[in-house]
């Protein structure tokens, strides 16, 4: 049981004014050993009450115990401590006190280890810079790729009789463009460029679709469950019109709703993308140990970043939730590859994405 309850847990001084030590009248700092006392009387009681032979008063126990006189008679001061309710059984033994201090030291060390180092902060800035240059602004550029006119209306009724080819062509163009931007993002990362070209290709083929959906989440609206990319609005019905199955789209929407509720900002999206990128278990990877170390480093940075941003990132177990969503993306990745090759003509219209999904 802890010996001290600080004033933060007491009634505020602003409301009731300062509190005084019930032993000597000095300003109290908290409840110590079951009584409201100052630091001086707290320390005195701890030191004195555990002694085998207690102090003796030469004046028959009639000494005044005040802030000015408290040092004059230890016996009367100790007796007053006991009279006001201070309890010997609440004093930790030397062994228990040492254990508590050791626990406190470990907590301080753990807290220090969770703080981002300068090198880790620089890596976040590198990731964030590449993400801001190549991924963040790409959705506003979808308007360049011949969108059907009805995509411009955010409150449009769906038009099931609209020709599918213009929408299919637009879909192929924006997906190819997104993959190109993701490639630029990865090539802007020195850690990624340090790998062999073969492993770079393997990692990109494995992670491109996952990074695409992590990034696309920034455009997702929880209320409407639509994606707003610049002046364009994409609904689930558009993907159905192109040929995607409802079961697959339900996976997509569930992922985006779950991730959007976590209220991430660009640094967290960039770190999550890096986690997906540096996955050592992708097919064709040869430098598995090196890539595993890179992913561990990014994971540590993500966890430490979350700890540093606790006041903003209120979600409990956020790191664990993000790891779960990355695992969910693996299933989406596999299902997406199947859909791309199932929809007639789509793979041929976007050979780059077709190669990635092969």
From Swiss-Prot:
Example GO molecular function: sequence-specific double-stranded DNA binding
Subunit-level organization: Heterodimer of NR1I3 and RXR. Interacts with PSMC4. Interacts with ECT2. Directly interacts with DNAJC7; this complex may also include HSP90. Interacts with CRY1. Interacts with CRY2 in a ligand-dependent manner.
InterPro entries, per database record: NHR-like_dom_sf, Nucl_hrmn_rcpt_lig-bd, Nuclear_hormone_rcpt_NR1, Nuclear_hrmn_rcpt, ThyrH_rcpt, Znf_hrmn_rcpt, Znf_NHR/GATA
Post-translational modification: Phosphorylated at Thr-48 by PKC, dephosphorylation of Thr-48 is required for nuclear translocation and activation.
Protein localization: Nucleus; Cytoplasm; Cytoplasm, Cytoskeleton
Organism: Rattus norvegicus
Designated name of the protein: Nuclear receptor subfamily 1 group I member 3
Residue span(s) of domain NR LBD: 119-358
CDD domains: NR_DBD_VDR_like
Lineage: Eukaryota, Metazoa, Chordata, Craniata, Vertebrata
GO biological process terms, semicolon-separated: cell differentiation; intracellular receptor signaling pathway; negative regulation of DNA-templated transcription; negative regulation of transcription by RNA polymerase II; osteoblast differentiation; positive regulation of transcription by RNA polymerase II; regulation of DNA-templated transcription
